């Protein structure tokens, strides 16, 4: 079985983290975002994954190296399909047609790379086989459907009737979750040009009464921007608590759900949690307070520092008694000096912060 992951976005909303890496390779819960998806696909028998990447030469180099590393580690075939111009969300499928179709007639998965969930892919295969349609999409319930494109469907069968973009009147509360299972015949509907699968292809299939939607059980989050990244981490750790609690940290210094890489060092008198991920090679000195945050690979947090609701990029340093909070994002190799207050600061790579950031600001 095969799958395609759409990884062509530029990740502008997660800058500065995406200035040096494609968004799918930014760490989430101590591993690249996209690796969560690849592991889930391999677990249900997918043996080849196509990464649909954008036209930038640098992305091909970085994603190819990642692909080689994952192939060697997981034993799953990964290939890249690179567009020469922006092709939207459907055009990349047409471009990768020869990689996705092998004559077996098997359906293939398509995933958006910035979606994090429980990935109930086996259930989706069973759903797809049962309804006998041409395509299945996963949907999730939201509290404010007027902000999204809503999927209107038959509750009994799951057949999609229509899509309504940002409805002013209530028509439903289910939205596209960015996980699809498609028959090869769907590719016959897609031309090799900039095309939206959500706005052009799926409405065609729905009109033919061959599109079905499965309600996603468990959590879901599009982690394309910092606040959603932090929320997604909380939901992911909640799920991990239910499925694999042994992977979470324990001890008198741990509060709630915390994920700590085995190579990280934690000092005495710390209070860590809830909803914290501490990456490989991190050093957290004594008396540190961490909550609702991600501390990526190689970060050094000095004594009595406090970090909350923030993302600390690779190999950065947070000084003694410093306070970083309110959706601050530190890029790679940032140095926050002792006793500095960072309130919603977005700090680019390789910067030294010597004075307080009193209100949300970008440090170039």
Curated annotation (Swiss-Prot):
Known catalysed reaction(s)? alpha-D-mannose 1-phosphate + GTP + H(+) = GDP-alpha-D-mannose + diphosphate
Might you name a Gene Ontology BP term for this protein?
Answer: GDP-mannose biosynthetic process
Query: What Gene Ontology terms describe what this protein does at the molecular function level?
Result: GTP binding; mannose-1-phosphate guanylyltransferase (GTP) activity
> What is the enzyme's class at the highest EC level?
transferase
Tell me its EC number(s), please. 2.7.7.13
This protein's pathway reads: Nucleotide-sugar biosynthesis; GDP-alpha-D-mannose biosynthesis; GDP-alpha-D-mannose from alpha-D-mannose 1-phosphate (GTP route): step 1/1
What keywords tag this UniProt record?
A: GTP-binding, Nucleotide-binding, Nucleotidyltransferase, Transferase
Q: What does this protein do?
A: Catalyzes a reaction of the Smirnoff-Wheeler pathway, the major route to ascorbate biosynthesis in plants.
Q: Which protein are we looking at?
A: Probable mannose-1-phosphate guanylyltransferase 2
User: Which organism is the protein's source?
Assistant: Arabidopsis thaliana (Mouse-ear cress)
Q: What lineage is on file?
A: Eukaryota, Viridiplantae, Streptophyta, Embryophyta, Tracheophyta
